[in-house]
C-alpha cells in the first residue's frame, strides 16, 4: 500500500546523491544489541550485524501480523495511529496502535475471518459527512471491510463482496486510490490466486444513500506471471499510479485512474532482478516515500533477506517509468511482508518520516526515515525538501 495525504498533495522524495557503498554501510549501522528494558508485551528483537534497529516495536498481536497502514491525525500528528492486520481464520483482527506501539483495545476490531491487508484513505463522503476510512480484506468471508477513522466503527453493513461469480475469490492485497481531479475513492483489490490477465479488480466506494459504504466494480486489470501470487499493492495518489508485486517476477505499474488513457496497459515492470544482485526470492511489500515536488522513493521488501530495496519514485527525465534501484537497507524485522511509510513528522522520534514494517514475531516495527536514508537519500519532513 502507499500512504495517502489528507490534502491530496503527496509527500514524495527527490534523489540527490548516487549510491555509495561506504555511505550505505555507515547508514545501516546499528547497535549490536536491542534495548533490554522493553515493557511487558513487547517482543525482543535480535538485530543482525549491520541492520537498522527500530525506534519502536509494538506490543504483540495474538496470532500473525501481516500488513500495516498509517492514519495521520488532521490537527495533531502526534495522535496519529497505525492500523495492522492479525491473520487468523476465525479470530483475526484489525489492531490499532499509537505511536508508542501500544495497542488501543477500544479501537481494535475482532473477530474477522483472516483479515489480510489494510489501507487508509481520507475524505469519503458518507451520510453527508467527510469520513476517513480504513479498509481491510477479509479473506475468509470474500469481502472487504470498511471502518471509519479514528473510531474504527463499521460503516459497510457487514462487508462488500468482491470477485463475485469467480472461482478464485479469496481477497488478499488492497490499496485505496483517491482521484485528484474529483476526490472519487477506489479500492484496488488483489486475491490469493487468479488469472493471467485481470488479476486485480477495482471498486468505486460510495454511500448507498443510507450511510453504508458499497463498492461498484469499475474494471478488471493487471497481468500475472503465475510464478507465485500477488499480495502487495500500493497507489501513488498524486501521480496516479498503482504498483503491485507479482512475486518472483517484479513490480508492475499501471494507471490507477480507470478512466485514464491507456489505463489497461502495463507501464513498467521493475524490481525484477533476482539472485546475488537482486531479490533473494520474492519481491513483497511496497511503500512510497513521497515529497511534494513529485519525486521520492519506492521501497520493496526483499522478504527472505530481511532487506528493503529502494527505487526512485519519479523515474528518469526521459522515461518516468524507469524506476532506478538506488539502495538496499537491512532491517531487524524478520520475514517482513507489508509495510507503510510517510514523510509527515508525527513526532520527534521520526523527524523526516515514519516507516512501519511487519515482523513475523507478531509485531510491527517503526523506523525513522533518517536512519533508512542515511546521507545518500533525500529527507523531506512533511514532504518538503530542506534547503
What do the PLM-derived regions correspond to, one by one?
Residues 140-185, 190-191:
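Asp-box/WD-like beta-propeller blade repeats and closely related beta-sheet repeat scaffolds
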Residues 24-27:
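C-terminal motif of bacterial Sec signal peptides marking the signal peptidase cleavage site
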Residues 75, 99-102, 124-125, 147-155, ...:
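Short loop/turn segments immediately following beta-strands, especially the blade-tip
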Residues 270-284, 318-346:
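Conserved blade-ending motifs and adjacent loop-strand segments that build the rim/top face
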Residues 99-142:
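Blade-loop segments of beta-propeller domains
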Residues 64-78, 117-129, 170-183, 231-240, ...:
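Structural signature of eukaryotic scaffold interfaces centered on beta-propeller domains
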Residues 278-325:
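Loop/turn-rich, solvent-exposed surfaces of beta-rich toroidal or solenoidal domains
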Residues 55-92:
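Beta-strand-rich domains and repeat architectures in extracellular enzymes and scaffolds
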